[in-house]
């Protein structure tokens, strides 16, 4: 859909830097349950929390690996690029392949499947190192919208080893190809980047993301194993928190548009000018803020909310220059006959 704005990675890295110091320390390798071992990717940072969580799943010699780690200098938030454009020409961080290969060797384990939650480099970047270490895994890499040489994952597909039955669940929104994985023996869900152990995630498509959160909740899983952060002990509660957070942003947006439109009839911005521009929305919601903050942080986030509401036919917009586009709340009677919303 046209008009969406990419998130600016460097800005968000600086903006989120402060939360690193408040995160709990996670062990490099941890048995988080009797059938799940978490191995950190060695890439802690503002965008990755304590680092990418990779998981070995099963109880026998043969295990399932969920996610690899990070490509060197990978850009986590290049959400505007399609999966097919991401070329893994660089090897991953050496600390991750060292950790996992040592663990596999020490415990006499082998991998039967390598499942990738989505295409972002902090989840797929370790694949070249893994194949260099174990060439026999070349036909065991699985990803939705697979890269060359990889196998596809379909919604509902089952992967089984001794002690673990893992079912793939298609959950787009954070990325177009995002998959979660349900561990049936534990009624647990590997949540990928859709739900994190700390804070909130970002969405490439907010409408699909909200739908996916609902799909995840409908599974009724009690435990969440996120791709970043600590184990989620109460996944239903966390999912409700995520959905309420997003819904709160939608209510705030609708309230702002409705209020400003009503005031516009008295001569302020609003209906008299055919709605509010993005900059006017920012001022109405947050007051005067630096333009850099608007362009690099608030605008992309608020546009996701606006497009979601437009798809729900709760707001409309005047077609034209995306930067000058005017948005307005729809009243109930206009929702089914308004022009200017995405189909």
Swiss-Prot record:
Biological source species: Arthroderma otae (strain ATCC MYA-4605 / CBS 113480) (Microsporum canis)
Catalytic activity, EC: 3.1.-.-
Keyword list, A-Z: Hydrolase, Metal-binding, Zinc
Chain sites annotated for binding Zn(2+) 2: 122-123
Protein name per UniProt: Lactamase-like protein nscB
Cofactor(s) needed by this chain: Zn(2+)
Single GO term (MF): hydrolase activity
The encoding gene: nscB
Broadest EC class assigned to this enzyme: hydrolase
Residues at the active site: 122
């Amino acid at each position: 859909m046209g008009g969406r704005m990419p998130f600016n990675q460097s800005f968000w890295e600086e903006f989120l830097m402060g939360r690193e110091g408040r995160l709990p320390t996670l062990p490099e390798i941890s048995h988080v349950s009797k059938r799940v071992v978490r191995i950190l990717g060695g890439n802690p940072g503002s965008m990755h929390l304590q680092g990418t969580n990779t998981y070995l799943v099963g109880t026998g010699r043969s295990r399932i690996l969920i996610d690899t780690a990070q490509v060197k200098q990978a850009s986590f938030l290049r959400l505007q690029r399609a999966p097919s454009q991401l070329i893994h020409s660089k090897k991953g961080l050496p600390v991750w392949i060292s950790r996992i290969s040592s663990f596999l060797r020490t415990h006499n384990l082998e991998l039967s499947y390598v499942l990738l939650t989505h295409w972002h480099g902090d989840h797929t970047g370790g694949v070249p190192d893994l194949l260099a270490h174990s060439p026999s895994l070349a036909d065991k890499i699985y990803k939705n919208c697979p890269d060359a040489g990889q196998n596809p994952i379909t919604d509902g597909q089952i992967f089984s080893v001794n002690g673990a039955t893992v079912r793939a669940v298609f959950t787009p929104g954070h990325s177009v190809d995002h998959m979660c994985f349900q561990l049936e023996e534990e009624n647990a869900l590997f949540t990928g980047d859709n739900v994190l152990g700390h804070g909130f995630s970002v969405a490439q498509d907010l409408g699909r993301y909200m739908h996916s959160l609902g799909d995840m909740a409908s599974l009724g899983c009690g435990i969440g194993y996120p791709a970043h952060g600590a184990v989620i002990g109460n996944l239903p509660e966390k999912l409700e928190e995520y959905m309420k957070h997003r819904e709160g942003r939608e209510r705030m947006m609708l309230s702002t548009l409705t209020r400003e439109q009503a005031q516009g009839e008295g001569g302020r911005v609003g209906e008299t000018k055919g709605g509010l521009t993005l900059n006017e929305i920012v001022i109405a919601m947050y007051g005067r803020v630096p333009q850099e903050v608007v362009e690099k942080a608030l605008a992309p986030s608020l546009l996701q909310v606006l497009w979601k509401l437009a798809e729900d036919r709760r707001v409309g917009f005047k077609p034209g220059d995306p930067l000058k586009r005017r948005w307005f709340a729809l009243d109930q009677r206009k929702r089914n006959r308004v022009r200017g919303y995405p189909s």
